[in-house]
UniProtKB/Swiss-Prot annotation:
The keyword Signal does not apply. This is Lysine--tRNA ligase. It catalyses: tRNA(Lys) + L-lysine + ATP = L-lysyl-tRNA(Lys) + AMP + diphosphate. CDD domains: LysRS_core, LysRS_N. The gene is lysS. InterPro entries: Aa-tRNA-synt_II, aa-tRNA-synth_II, aa-tRNA-synth_II/BPL/LPL, Lys-tRNA-ligase_II, Lys-tRNA-ligase_II_bac/euk, Lys-tRNA-ligase_II_N, Lys-tRNA-synth_II_C, NA-bd_OB-fold. One of its GO terms (biological process) is lysyl-tRNA aminoacylation. The lineage of its organism: Bacteria, Pseudomonadati, Pseudomonadota, Gammaproteobacteria, Enterobacterales. SUPFAM superfamilies: Class II aaRS and biotin synthetases, Nucleic acid-binding proteins. Pfam families: tRNA-synt_2, tRNA_anti-codon.
C-alpha cells in the first residue's frame, strides 16, 4: 500500500496558513448570519444548459433573455478588476459565470465575492449569453455563497497524484477527476439498465438476508459476526442463491436480486471483500436459455449505455455485437495447450502430472474434476479475451448445478469470460433433493479435510427442495467487473466508490 509522502515544511506552513485564513472568513460569515444558507434553489444543471443552448448563437440567446439559476463548486476564478470569470462545477459538468461588480447588489463584488475561495459552493442567477470565443456563460445578476469550504481543492485543481488518496478520500477524487465522476455515472446507468432489462422480461426484484445462520450459495470463506439478542454467531452472506431458489420453490418463477456479497478473502485488482452481484433464477428454463439471456443483456447494455456494441478496453476491443464464442472446458484446454491429450484429462494420475508441470500445487482432497478445472484456469482462462462461454464444468466443482444427462461427471453449467476474467456463472439448477444432500455431505468432508471454502450443510434448503423446485436455471454476474469492462478500468477499486483499504496513517 502506498502512503502519502510527508509535506515539505514550506508546503505544510502554506497549507496551515490557508486553513487558518478560511476559518477566519467563516467566523466573519457567522457574525453576519450569512453562513450556510439553505434557501437557494437551482432550476438547471450545467449539462442541461449545454444540451439545450450550446447550439444557439449569442444574438438568439440575448433575444430570448433566458434567466437561469445554477449552483455548484467554484473551481477557477479570473479576477480582472471590476469583472471576473468563474468556472462552476456541478453534477452535470461545468458552466462559466460572468461576474460584474456593477450588476450585483452593492458591496457583493468587493466585500464578499473577491474574498471567497476556490472550492466554495455558490448559487448564481442570471441570463445566458455566449462570449466572443463562443462559450456558453451566465451573466450573473445574483451570486451567493452557500457553503464555505474550509480546505483547499486538491492539488490546485490539477487532480490527485496519489492513488491511495483517490480511494481513501473519494470525495476529493470526484471533485477533481472527470473520469472518476463519469465512471460512477456509467455504473449507475448499468444498474438501471439491468433492472429495466429484467423487469421487461417479467422478473421480480427481491431482497434476501444479508446475515445468515448458514452461509451458502458459493465456495468462499465467510465473514463472521455476532447477533447479541440471539447470542448467535451469524455470517455475512457470500451469495443469495439458496434463498432465491427457496422463492422459486414458493412459486415466484422469475426473481432477481442486485446486492452486496461478502467474502473474507484477499484484495487484488479484481477482488474486493465486499462486492456487488446480480443473481437471477428462472423456472422452466435451462443453462442454454441463460446463455442467450446473458448475451442479450451485455449487447443491450453496451448499446444503451455506451452507444455501441464495440467496447474499448486498454489496447483491446470487446465486440458484443457478434455471436459469443462457446467452448467446453476441455476444448479450451486443448485450444490453448495443444500438446495436451484429451485422454489424459480423463485420467487422474496423468492430470496430476499435467497440473504439476504447470506449477499447480495439487491438494490431497482434489478429485479429477478439480484437477481439470485448475488446469483450465492455468492454461486457458487468461486467453479468453472476447466474450466466451465455457461449458461442461465438473460436478466436483459445481455442488449446486444439475448433472448432465449424458455424463454425470459434468454439469449443465457455464462461466462467462471477457478480457481473461470470469464475469458470470450460470447453470441448470440441481433440483434433486437427495443428490443435493449427497453433495452437501461431500462439501462437509472437504471442509473437514481442511478446505475452508467448502460449503456448509444446509438442511432447510434440502427440505425446500423436497417440496419441489421446478426445472430452474440460475445466473450470477459480477457488477463490479462488468463496470470495469464498460469504463475501461483496470482495477476494481476504480469502480467501487469506497473500496476496502488498510487503515491509513493519520
Amino acid at each position: 500500500m502506498s502512503e502519502q509522502q510527508p509535506q515539505a515544511p514550506d508546503a505544510a506552513l502554506e497549507l496551515n496558513n490557508e486553513l487558518k485564513a478560511r476559518r477566519e472568513k467563516l467566523v466573519a460569515l457567522r457574525a453576519t448570519g450569512l453562513a450556510f444558507p439553505n434557501d437557494f434553489r437551482r432550476d438547471r444543471t450545467s449539462d442541461q444548459l449545454h444540451a439545450e443552448f450550446d447550439g444557439k448563437e449569442n444574438e438568439e440567446l440575448e433575444a430570448l433573455g433566458i434567466e437561469v439559476s445554477v449552483a455548484g463548486r467554484m473551481m477557477t476564478r479570473r479576477i480582472m478588476g471590476k469583472a471576473s470569470f468563474v468556472t462552476l462545477q456541478d453534477v452535470g459538468g461545468r458552466i462559466q459565470l460572468y461576474v460584474s461588480r456593477d450588476d450585483l447588489a452593492e458591496g457583493i463584488y468587493n466585500e464578499q465575492f473577491k474574498k471567497w475561495d476556490l472550492g466554495d459552493i455558490l448559487g448564481a442567477r442570471g441570463k445566458l449569453f455566449k462570449t466572443k470565443t463562443g462559450e456558453l456563460s451566465i451573466h450573473c445578476s445574483e451570486l451567493r455563497l452557500l457553503t464555505k469550504a474550509l480546505r483547499p481543492l486538491p492539488d490546485k485543481f490539477h487532480g490527485l497524484a496519489d492513488q491511495e488518496t483517490r480511494y481513501r478520500q473519494r470525495y476529493l477524487d470526484l471533485i477533481a477527476n472527470d473520469d472518476s465522476r463519469n465512471t460512477f455515472k456509467i455504473r449507475s446507468q448499468i444498474m438501471a439498465g439491468i433492472r429495466s432489462f429484467m423487469v421487461d422480461r417479467d422478473f421480480m426484484e427481491v431482497e434476501t438476508p444479508m446475515m445468515q445462520a448458514i452461509p451458502g450459495g458459493a465456495s468462499a470463506r465467510p465473514f463472521i459476526t455476532h447477533h447479541n439478542a440471539l447470542d448467535l454467531d451469524m455470517y455475512l452472506r457470500i451469495a443469495p442463491e439458496l434463498y432465491l431458489k427457496r422463492l422459486v420453490v414458493g412459486g415466484f418463477d422469475r426473481v432477481f436480486e442486485i446486492n452486496r456479497n461478502f467474502r473474507n478473502e484477499g484484495i487484488s485488482p479484481r477482488h474486493n471483500p465486499e462486492f456487488t452481484m446480480m443473481e437471477l433464477y428462472m423456472a422452466y428454463a435451462d443453462y442454454k436459455d441463460l446463455i442467450e439471456l446473458t448475451e442479450s443483456l451485455f449487447r443491450t447494455l453496451a448499446q444503451d449505455v455506451l452507444g455501441s456494441t464495440v467496447v474499448p478496453y486498454g489496447d483491446q476491443q470487446f465486440d458484443f455485437g457478434k455471436p459469443f464464442e462457446k467452448l467446453t472446458m476441455k476444448e479450451a484446454i486443448l485450444k490453448y495447450r495443444p500438446q495436451t491429450d484429451l485422454a489424459d484429462l480423463a485420467d487422474f494420475d496423468k492430470s496430476v502430472a499435467i497440473a504439476q508441470s504447470l506449477g499447480i500445487k495439487v491438494e490431497k482432497s482434489w478429485g479429477l474434476g478439480r484437477l481439470v478445472t485448475e488446469i483450465f484456469e492455468e492454461t486457458a482462462e487468461a486467453h479468453l479475451i472476447q466474450p466466451t462461454f465455457i461449458t461442461e464444468y465438473p460436478a466436483e466443482v459445481s455442488p449446486l448445478a444439475r448433472r448432465n444427462d449424458m455424463d454425470p461427471e459434468i454439469t449443465d453449467r457455464f462461466e462467462f469470460f471477457i478480457g481473461g476474467r470470469e464475469i458470470g456463472n450460470g447453470f441448470s439448477e440441481l433440483n434433486d433433493a437427495q443428490d443435493q444432500a449427497e453433495r452437501f455431505l461431500q462439501q462437509v468432508n472437504a471442509k473437514d479435510a481442511g478446505d475452508d471454502e467448502a460449503m456448509f450443510y444446509d438442511e432447510d434448503y434440502v427440505t425446500a427442495l423436497e417440496h419441489g423446485l421446478p426445472p430452474t436455471a440460475g445466473l450470477g454476474i459480477g457488477i463490479d467487473r462488468m463496470v470495469m469492462l464498460f469504463t475501461n478500468s483496470h482495477t476494481i477499486r476504480d469502480v467501487i466508490l469506497f473500496p476496502a483499504l488498510r487503515p491509513g496513517s493519520k
